[in-house]
Amino acid sequence: MISKLLKIVLLTAGVIGNTLADSRIHEQYLVKAFPNEPVDYEGRMHAGHLNQTDQLDGDLFFWMFESVKPEYEHRSILWLNGGPGCSSEDGSLMEVGPFRLDDNNTFQLNPGRWDELGNLLFVDQPLGTGYSYSLAKDFQSNNEKMANDFSIFFEKFLEEFPERANDEWFIAGESFAGQYIPHIAAKLKEKNLVNLGGLAIGNGWINPLSHYETYLNYLVEKGMVDFESELGQYLHHSWAECLLAFDKIGSGSGDLSKCESFLGDILYMVSKEPGKACMNMYDISLESTYPTCGMDWPYDLSYLTEFLSTREAMTSLNVNLEKVHDWEECNDDVALQYAREGIESSSKLIQDLVSTVPILLFYGENDFLCNYLSGEKLTRSLEWNGAVGFQNQSAQPFYLPGYSDQPSGSYVSSRNLTFARIVEASHMVPYDHPNEMKTLITAFFNNDFASLPSVPKPSPDLGNGNYKWLYLGLIPVALTIIILFSIYLCRRFGLFGLSKQRYQPISPTP
């Protein structure tokens, strides 16, 4: 009995000791006073560098938001933005993080926040991206090195935050993260570091060839180019030269100058004022000035860059101020290094991973650069789990309750792979369609796409169908009756000091 009691005491002491040790370890990363944090934010944040310069050619920066919902405290979500070389703080402060910065330098809670679905981890990577830094001026960037560096970082992260080691992990991101995510997932599986619950890639740059192949078709489908017109024929010729270049280089890696020229022709010519205005390549519903064509979008970027470059913001996030002096959204040096190395398709990795890991490919329909037609082309040719493509399976619409009688998007799901489209959404779906994105990703995290509303469901308090408009029409009638009845009571009984006798009429002065 005494030995059992002693064992319990020792175990308890060990647990308390480990908890205190974890607290001390976490203390150096705790975000204690984030500038202009919303007063109603109830979560906890950790951020900083893991001091791995002995293992890496620099140090990666992370920012983690703990789940505000206890039921999801053992689900963790890694979010990565693309580029290559673009900071994941785009995701933390403009897309899926708990709050967003407005033009008054104040933060508002984000209705599309994902920290209500699990712990959220944002990492600036590869080295040299965002708050991360590289010690080597002529640093190397390619998918193999990127994935290896990330795995080294992640091993250390789990040492510092051991409570996250047994979580179910999802990896999500967009754009060039269509390269990052499959390579990182494969490396983490190879090292058996985490339990992978799924991968979600938005408007992903997965197979370069499929994007260039579909650009002209996308413009025609959207009514922006008439294929039979002089412009359509010119672009068709430019498009053919691009595809010929791909045939010559075989794998899709190498010199893409013909394809870049094709893209340049589109941005210059598909406009009411060629050379002055152009479409926003990330959201075709928006116009831009040439030659930016969307590179200055989202427009929040100007004040986000200014805020994240302040000493106050960097100090609060435990940024190494000796190595990092400001924040920039994208590092051109990282992009150039990737361009030199060449970019191959990551579709083979996706094909291998989906055999054991659920994957969601989602696309904002207004994105030109990484458009949904390229995703459809990819999935049609992809062979996974014993079959090719979705086997003529039809896409199902999904709706947001109470928002509209029109579908918010559509999805098709089979054999561990789901393909989804979000109506009128941009390259950054969570940025401009946060509720649709949160609805979709919740179904994915829970492996329950059947929960997505497949028919219009107006808000419960408004009924459904024509009853909604009946209720809305009755509201002003009811208010009028209440007001008239109140006036009657006041005059009849002198309520609230408004009896007929209270004031005598005042005659006008002659």
Swiss-Prot record:
Chain ranges sitting on the Cytoplasmic side read: 490-510
Entry EC number(s)? 3.4.16.6
Instruction: Write down the Pfam families for this protein, in alphabetical order.
Output: Peptidase_S10
Query: What are the alphabetically sorted keywords of the record?
Result: Apoptosis, Carboxypeptidase, Glycoprotein, Golgi apparatus, Hydrolase, Membrane, Protease, Signal, Transmembrane, Transmembrane helix, Vacuole
Residue ranges annotated as Lumenal topological domain:
22-468
GO biological process per UniProt: proteolysis
Q: Where are the transmembrane segments?
A: 469-489
Database matches in SUPFAM superfamilies = alpha/beta-Hydrolases
State the superkingdom: Eukaryota
Q: List, in alphabetical order, the Gene Ontology terms for molecular function in this entry.
A: serine-type carboxypeptidase activity
Decide whether keyword Glycoprotein is in the record. Answer: yes
Return the broad EC class: hydrolase
Membrane topology of the entry = Single-pass type I membrane protein
Residues in the active site? S175, D367, H427
Function, as annotated, reads:
Protease with a carboxypeptidase B-like function involved in the C-terminal processing of the lysine and arginine residues from protein precursors. Promotes cell fusion and is involved in the programmed cell death.
Belongs to which family? Belongs to the peptidase S10 family.
Name the UniProt record assigns to this protein: Pheromone-processing carboxypeptidase kex1
